[in-house]
Amino acid sequence: MEKLTNVQAQQEEEEEEGPLSVTKLIGGSITAKDIKLLQQASLHTVESVANATKKQLMAIPGLGGGKVEQIITEANKLVPLGFLSARTFYQMRADVVQLSTGSKELDKLLGGGIETGSITEIFGEFRCGKTQLCHTLAVTCQLPISQKGGEGKCMYIDTENTFRPERLAAIAQRYKLNESEVLDNVAFTRAHNSDQQTKLIQMAAGMLFESRYALLIVDSAMALYRSDYIGRGELAARQNHLGLFLRMLQRLADEFGVAVVITNQVTASLDGAPGMFDAKKPIGGHIMAHSSTTRLYLRKGKGETRICKIYDSPCLPESEAMFAILPDGIGDARES
């Protein structure tokens, strides 16, 4: 009995370190039925409830105005709103995990790797290495933190039918990982339209709470929007839907500390931006630009080599690095 109590105490301690289960709101007039309604609305943590607007909670079928007020009050008690010093936040940032890209030069450019708890957008033309980088990250995120991994699973949403599990197996061999275990640790799904894409992100919230995931990939985030919303007449509707989708991704990154990686396509820039020698820009407009924490621009080099440029980042300087697409994933470019 004492051993069981110790196990329960350890589980509770581990739970306190991560997001709080929405079941902690049960008490008083808040019942298990109310909690189920919140979970059906993809609100699995107290943090997600505390960060939701009153309007969003009122829209949940079965929850009345009085009950919503009580839920908000209890959630704010567990997750109080307030300020912290920049020094405290600086210390918290020191613990942020970064995932290796497979290339030492690319990791150096990124200050260590792909940052967890934020959205990284990777854009470029076809065959520039976006999907190959995603496949490599799907494996490296499973490595121990001491080996520049995230010690977690990967969630992979494919919208263009480019996911290949055999590619993961080859990359797993490179890192001397068990192929079957690596494949088991990647939750894969296909999205065929933008509504499905959003629905899958809602489903992801529950999966992230139930198990340890280090990485969420959407390859590509914009492809389905380009086919579902055609012409200027649907542009406003597309951007509104896209904004909702990206806010959901940011919420998952904030709550679960997962690295969110999305790929994007480019289009010709009619005004010549970003430069007179490379008149291409990522699609998605200002909504995509402001939602992505870090934006990486990939372009082709000679042979298997590719070039990555820091297009936008809150802390990284504008710079470039060369990497290569190798049989066993992304790696450093070989000297010719």
From Swiss-Prot:
GO molecular function, one term: ATP-dependent activity, acting on DNA
Main subcellular localisation: nucleus
GO biological process, one term: intracellular mRNA localization
Gene3D superfamilies, sorted: 5' to 3' exonuclease, C-terminal subdomain (1.10.150.20), P-loop containing nucleotide triphosphate hydrolases (3.40.50.300)
Tissue: Highly expressed in ovaries.
Keyword list, A-Z: ATP-binding, Cytoplasm, Developmental protein, DNA damage, DNA repair, DNA-binding, Meiosis, Nucleotide-binding, Nucleus
Database matches in Pfam families: HHH_5, Rad51
Annotated positions binding ATP: 124-131
Keyword field contains Transmembrane: no
Recorded GO CC terms: condensed nuclear chromosome; cytoplasm
UniProt subcellular location: Nucleus; Cytoplasm
Superkingdom of the organism of origin: Eukaryota
Bias kind Polar residues: ranges: 1-10
Stretch list, region Disordered: 1-20
UniProt keyword DNA damage, yes or no: yes
UniProt-listed InterPro entries: AAA+_ATPase, DNA_recomb/repair_Rad51, DNA_recomb/repair_Rad51_C, DNA_recomb/repair_RecA-like, DNA_repair_Rad51/TF_NusA_a-hlx, P-loop_NTPase, RecA_ATP-bd, RecA_monomer-monomer_interface
Subunit record text: Interacts with Rrp6; the interaction is required for the recruitment of spn-A to the DNA-damage response foci.
NCBIfam families: PRK04301.1, recomb_RAD51
Chain's role: Plays an important role in homologous strand exchange, a key step in DNA repair through homologous recombination (HR). Binds to single and double-stranded DNA and exhibits DNA-dependent ATPase activity. Underwinds duplex DNA. Spindle genes are required for each of the symmetry-breaking steps that generate polarity during egg axis formation; oocyte positioning at the posterior of the cyst to generate the first AP polarity and inhibition of gurken (grk) signaling to the follicle cell layer to polarize first the AP axis and then DV axis. May have a role in female meiosis.
UniProt similarity note: Belongs to the RecA family. RAD51 subfamily.
Name of protein: DNA repair protein Rad51 homolog
Protein's organism: Drosophila melanogaster
Record lineage: Eukaryota, Metazoa, Ecdysozoa, Arthropoda, Hexapoda
Gene name linked to the record: spn-A
